[in-house]
Amino acid sequence: MNSMIISCAISVCKTVKEKFKASKLNSAIERVYSVISRSWQNSVITRAVKTENSKTKNSILSRVMMSPFTLLEKISVKIGDKLSDRIEKSVICELCRSYVQNAMALNSRFMGIMALSMSIVYNILKFASTGYINKYIIILSVVSAFFVIFNVNIMGFCNTSKLVEFIKHCLGFDKVSFDFWDDLRTTGRIRLVAGAMVGVLTGAVMYVSPIIGILVPFAVFGMLLVLQYPVTGVFAAVFLAPLISFSSMPLAGVCVWTLLSLVIHSLCDETFKWKREGAGVALLLFLAVLFVSSVFSFARMDSLVVWAMYFVFVTFYFAVINLIDTKEKAYGLLKVFAISGALVALYGIMQYVFGWNTSNAWIDEEMFAEETMRVYSTLANPNVLGEYLLLVLPVSIVLGIKSKKPLTKLVYLAVSAIVFVCLILTQSRGCWLGFMVSAALFITFYDGRWWMLAILALAFVPFVLPDTIMNRLMSIGDMGDSSTSYRVFIWMGTMGIVRNYFMGGIGMGEGAFAKVYPLFSYNSVIAPHSHNTFLQLLVEGGIPALAMFIAIIAVFFKNTHNGYRVCEKKSLDSAMLLGIASGVAGFLFQSMFDYTFYNYRVMAVFFMLIGINIALSGIVTRKRS
């Protein structure tokens, strides 16, 4: 019965589609779309974007800003071979490589030795201080000894698992194999020494702090894995950015370690050339301007701490464009990005359904008395969550509509639905408008003929969305809403700061803003920032900081366009470049109503996504040329 209904529905849809294609209305839409498309292609904007500016690349300023990378290349030419040879022959480095390979393989003997060493050290320290031993650790020792008897790579069983194959197929990772370790390093004694050393360290740390001690083997593995394969650090950063909810410092640590690992690899390879294309010069100038404003800040130390976080997350762009050098890596990273976003969105939906840790602190209770809940998931604030989802949603949609395998298509369309529902539940009006901007740009450049469908869909929106959502939408710009009037008063006060400090700014961060803003505030409104990213950059770094940020965005869209125009129309590459650019545009639109860089993790994701898109654009451009 169900199959008959589905078949009838598909048949009706096909009939309507064919009738519409043959209609005069479709012919009129085709003609209008063709005229607009030709006009855009011949416009001044398009011609300006197509123009290659080699003078900028070869300018003195560009060479100065890129001199650290030039210096690294010169050093690698002189010492690359010697350094690589020493690392290859080093016993310590061999221990590290063996640890990584056996941990990836989940070698039973290796894990048994590590757990046994940890158990013995922990109980020795426990007995020495208290006179007692932990019986559970004794049981772990017995189990560990049993594992030592066998020498099996447990991860190898994943290759033959039907469940694992099904999951890989659903997520679009069919080519990923679980035999990624070096078999030669899963035999011999040196791996056991490596396991025992980490086990001893784990046992000692566990005696002081059990929770931290348990994390030691994983932390050591992660650090050594990134040191051996720096690209894994990029994947880890993209996946973990929204999930580590308690602090931005772990993410900063991953980014710093990945950059250091990349530098070490570049020094060991005399043929390594740092990629300089894209927004690199503008990003470094942006950091330089903000550094100067921080040095002369009203709260110097606070500003320098904020600048240090900016430095880490902005320079991570260079790790992305240098390590993501193939389409497989780029799309693998984008899939990881979408999966991470789906987990964040799913948790947000569960917050709404089960009422977990929700609050009405972000709702004007007088104007929206029936609304009591806005979800924020792992990002502590509904607006921040919405800003993150604005970047995720276009990526997941493109993965859904362009996937060739039906099951993979279904999974990423489901991911898109989850992310979209969570975006609605944030009740962030600015983010809703940002998504509309993203959708409008994507439809216009992907296939303008979709506008008819989009307009029809918009006509049904009032009948589908709940009254609470419609009330929020209709309240946009209403000064009776406290959140709207609050922002307007903050902007008025911020403009007072700009008028007095437009050249150099007041310095970065809340500390400097808190010292200066009260002198210009309206209606005694207290605020930690200006609720507008462009205004905030103008306040913190003056006109030079805002100019550099606009330059970054301009270069980003220029690189995106250069990649887009060499791609086949409606291909996966062109759709993804367009999707990411649309997401960034929606994010920038929301930036007019909130300080979107206030949350470091969202700021990090923004610059990572810029790096991914520029890397993908470079890949398709080089392949074409």
Regions found by a protein language model. Give the residues of each.
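Hydrophobic alpha-helical transmembrane segments
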Residues: 542-553
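Flexible juxtamembrane loops connecting transmembrane helices in multi-pass membrane enzymes
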Residues: 158-170, 367-375, 431, 458-493, ...
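Transmembrane signal-anchor hairpin modules in multi-pass inner-membrane enzymes, especially those
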Residues: 1-292, 298-305, 325-331, 335, ...
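Alpha-helical transmembrane segments of multi-pass inner-membrane proteins
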Residues: 109-155, 188-208, 216-223, 258-259, ...
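Membrane-interface catalytic loops of GT-C/OST-like multi-pass glycosylation enzymes that act
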Residues: 301-305, 379-383, 426-430, 527-535, ...
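Alpha-helical transmembrane segments and their immediate interhelical/interface regions
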Residues: 298-321
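Long extracytoplasmic/lumenal interhelical loops at the membrane interface
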Residues: 469, 477-492, 496, 500, ...
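Membrane helix-loop boundary segments at the extracytoplasmic
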Residues: 125-130, 239-247, 538-541, 572-615
